[in-house]
Amino acid sequence: MTNLRKTHPLMKIVNSSFIDLPAPSNISSWWNFGSLLGVCLIIQILTGLFLAMHYTSDTMTAFSSVTHICRDVNYGWLIRYLHANGASMFFICLFLHVGRGLYYGSYMYLETWNIGVLLLFTVMATAFMGYVLPWGQMSFWGATVITNLLSAIPYIGSDLVEWIWSGFSVDKATLTRFFAFHFILPFIIAALAGVHLLFLHETGSNNPSGLSSDADKILFHPYYTIKDILGVFLLILTLTSLVLFSPDLLGDPDNYTHANPLNTPPHIKPEWYFLFAYAILRSIPNKLGGVLALVLSILILALVPFLHTSKQRSMMFRPFSQCLFWILVADLLTLTWIGGQPVEHPFIIIGQLASILYFLLILVIMPITSLLENNLMKW
């Protein structure tokens, strides 16, 4: 008798994706982040669902409903902090996942990579709208500043902003629609993640060497399921430690003050995971230029496959490219730091130099270095 998991219409999809999937025998722990992102998404959807049961998307009661969740709901504080810090863990896994893709040349799978870039944009949009919901000072002013950037678009900019706000400022209608979008987007993310996996399984996984692994495959289960479970345990350990010992470490104290349109906070800044893009935005004195640079800082990832000039896929055997990759990582950390600093000397010039270096590395320096490495190896 044939095994049910191989014949049943639903079970055979799961079987071919997670059980009998042929996987390269040499993939390292850097390949764990896909499953960790799936776990993060499940945590966010579940905690978000329970929060939505008690939250009210009204400017008069939003802030007090979050207070009510933390004080009066059974384990409400735990659910709220799991959701807030779960977003941080989501972005840590996301950045490491993208970094691994850049380092090992996974971007050569064009469809998978482009869906991934689309996923990154969607997750960023979801996180931004979620940050507005508690209706604290930073929620209100962050929403005002970021949505107002759309007014830089020629001709339709100001109309577009008023259309998004549903009025002349961020108000009740804006909060209600942000809550609606924040609720629906994670399910769209889940669907996109399914498409992401579909395209990945068309080609099979990449591996650290960047060479074809068709001659040496092993079963996904039990080898990589066990490996993924270890990663999940470490993720949950880190998340629970953060939630139980230092839940406000990554938050902003200003968000514990009720939103007040008449009182601007001294330093308006987004959550830590947007600071690198925020620093690039602030580095350009022109509004439209800043907005374009902000969008391009993420959209540049879609160009990476076309800038690949090396004859090797992975950076594993390319020491010069490796050095440049780690310079890029350091540059992004510098931008993250700058994004959280006030707009004054010397932070302005450091931010501008780091922004220039970011675009130069990806668009010019790394492709030229790859060509030089080809010549050094006489290819």
From Swiss-Prot:
Positions with a binding annotation for heme b b562: 83, 182
Additional information: Heme 1 (or BL or b562) is low-potential and absorbs at about 562 nm, and heme 2 (or BH or b566) is high-potential and absorbs at about 566 nm.
Described function: Component of the ubiquinol-cytochrome c reductase complex (complex III or cytochrome b-c1 complex) that is part of the mitochondrial respiratory chain. The b-c1 complex mediates electron transfer from ubiquinol to cytochrome c. Contributes to the generation of a proton gradient across the mitochondrial membrane that is then used for ATP synthesis.
GO cellular component, one term: mitochondrial inner membrane
Natural source organism: Sorex mirabilis (Ussuri shrew)
InterPro entries membership: Cyt_b/b6_C, Cyt_b/b6_C_sf, Cyt_b/b6_N, Cytb/b6-like_sf, Cytochrome_b, Cytochrome_b_C_euk/bac, Cytochrome_b_N_euk/bac, Di-haem_cyt_TM
Stated name of the protein: Cytochrome b
Keyword Iron carried by entry: yes
Topology class, membrane: Multi-pass membrane protein
